[in-house]
Amino acid sequence: MMRVESQQVAIRYLKTTDAAPLFENYLGDEQACRFLNRQAHQNVNQTLEAIERWCAQYDQKSPNLLVFAIEELTSQTPIGCLVLMPEQDSSEIHFGISARYRGKGYATQACKLGVVYLQSLGITRIRTAPHIGNHASIRVLEKCGFISQGILKAHAVFPALGREAQDCMDMQLEDIELRHFARCSE
């Protein structure tokens, strides 16, 4: 069972028992999901079905999608998700947490744990493309050493924001930053 901890949060494999708290804390919250590529879940069964699909990836030899719970250590409650999309020596990274837990450094800690985990897999380049209006996520990424490569025009659709493709920030963490990050992450 995969589990990595920082001072206040852990990233770990999801469990079916996470469905209710994860729906309540994050996946069912329309505001928390506004910058995702899908709508908020409508009920806990939708969250349970998603968790079952995501858990099936854990046993694959080379999974192309890894969704982990972000757990607050004190309460041992799942408060969000960390999504990794490894592909050979590079990966995408995405994260989100409940609005109730924002502003405490949890997303930054979870992102750093994700970077360290990807390094352990031999990943040397990590990228992500948050919506240009998602200032909190962009700030977390900058704290973790990601560098803006510019704006990706009409890059992705965010259903909560409408049907039109939205502009996103092209953020990357390259090999040099990864080596530096490994020394500075503790």
Q: Residues of each region from the PLM?
A:
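Hydrophobic alpha-helical segments with strong N-terminal bias
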Residues: 13, 41, 53-56, 83
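Helix-loop element at the rim of GNAT/NAT acetyltransferase active sites that forms part
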Residues: 24-39, 59
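Acyl-donor (CoA/ACP) binding surface of acyl/acetyltransferases
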Residues: 1-21, 25-31, 71-186
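A short hydrophobic/aromatic micro-motif that marks alpha-helical segments and, especially, helix-coil
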Residues: 43-45, 58, 160
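A short helix-loop-beta-strand connector motif used in the catalytic cores of GNAT acetyltransferases and
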Residues: 53-69
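Conserved GNAT-fold acetyl-CoA-binding loop/helix
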Residues: 33-53, 66
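Residue-level recognition of short, structured coil/turn motifs
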Residues: 37, 63, 120-123
